[in-house]
Amino acid sequence: MTILKQLITKANLILPSVDKKVATLDSLVSVFKEIKCKDLKIDKPLTLTKPIGNGKKVFYYPLVENEKFTLAIFAFPPNTCIPTHDHPQMTVLSKVLYGSISCDSFDWIDNTSNVKKQGKAIYTGTNILNSNDEKVKITLPNENNIHRFQSGDEHCAVLDLLYPPYDSNFYRSCTYYRPTSVNGSIVDLMPYYPDFDCEGDSSNKELNDLHIELSKLK
């Protein structure tokens, strides 16, 4: 069984019942961190991004989208960001496939609400993730749940496993935020609609075929 099929089979088996604490994620992380470009049929010199005019578009390649989880690739042109955004009631595993990315993370100071959409947050730090290590960034419902991804001077691709998936019917819609004031590590986050586009791309035959194959797994 390929490493991807191992991940999908395991995710279908244990999600969404798995506890959201980091310690219980080991069974997923141990497989997820081993996935490489070759497993996804990606030729690293041939990046998944396309020339664009404003530099504000990230390309989205779904691999599995079901009611339990989403597995997808986000491909960044150089010097491009996904603005600060949240993952309400969700856990996310993120791994860089090629290139490197900077991740600024935040947490709500008052996290008693599962559907909080504005207020004071604390900046929890910046991590640089790259393809030369096997580090997996773990985003939890109440820990580093709000973040911003920024690519550097090279193309970059990030593999994400999100569970449960975004779903507005269950108050899990993605909200983008803009800091309106900063006091040390404390920021006020207000929702806004950024000049940004995350575009689904169906032009890559290898990834399309992989999407079809993986979506059949139970």
UniProtKB/Swiss-Prot annotation:
UniProt keyword annotation of Nucleotidyltransferase present: no
Cofactor(s) demanded: Fe cation
Signal peptide: none
Name used for this protein in its record: Probable 2-aminoethanethiol dioxygenase
Keyword Oxidoreductase recorded: yes
Annotated gene: ado-1
EC number annotated for this UniProt entry: 1.13.11.19
A Pfam family recorded for this sequence: PCO_ADO
Catalytic activity: cysteamine + O2 = hypotaurine + H(+)
GO function terms (MF aspect): cysteamine dioxygenase activity; metal ion binding
Lineage per the UniProt record: Eukaryota, Amoebozoa, Evosea, Eumycetozoa, Dictyostelia
Superkingdom: Eukaryota
Alphabetical UniProt keywords: Dioxygenase, Iron, Metal-binding, Oxidoreductase
